[in-house]
């Protein structure tokens, strides 16, 4: 399996980021998160964050988090700041982004180079 990803960290939370905006979340995401998150044996991370197409009108994207144990999380402040930076550097260069999460719509604002506030 060939997989394009970005690994980012925010305040010691490190995740593997997948662009799922057009392809959708992989069907085996729970097993994939467990496999790729294993430190010393694979990429190693706190889990996988999928950057998906938004579900709320006016949102820029949706963030879905899959922890290293394969469970789905609702929200991660450090993770969403990295999603904002990823979106900003991959064509959505807006200083304020609206990102869907399982905890609702979150607004993330650019405070400076690589600095974001939720």
Regions found by a protein language model. Give the residues of each.
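A glycine-rich beta-to-alpha transition motif near the start of alpha/beta enzyme domains, typified by
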Residues: 1-112
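Short, solvent-exposed secondary-structure boundary/capping segments
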Residues: 114-118
């Amino acid at each position: 399996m060939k997989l394009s990803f970005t690994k980012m960290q925010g305040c010691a939370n490190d995740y593997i980021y997948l662009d799922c905006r057009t392809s959708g979340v992989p069907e085996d995401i729970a097993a994939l998160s467990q496999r790729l998150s294993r430190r010393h044996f694979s990429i190693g991370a706190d889990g996988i964050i999928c950057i998906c197409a938004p579900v709320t009108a006016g949102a820029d994207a949706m963030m879905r988090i899959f922890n290293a144990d394969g469970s789905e999380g609702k929200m991660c402040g450090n993770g969403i700041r990295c999603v904002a930076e990823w979106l900003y550097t991959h064509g959505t260069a807006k200083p304020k982004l609206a990102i869907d999460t399982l905890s609702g719509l979150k607004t993330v604002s650019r405070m400076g180079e690589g600095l974001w506030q939720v």
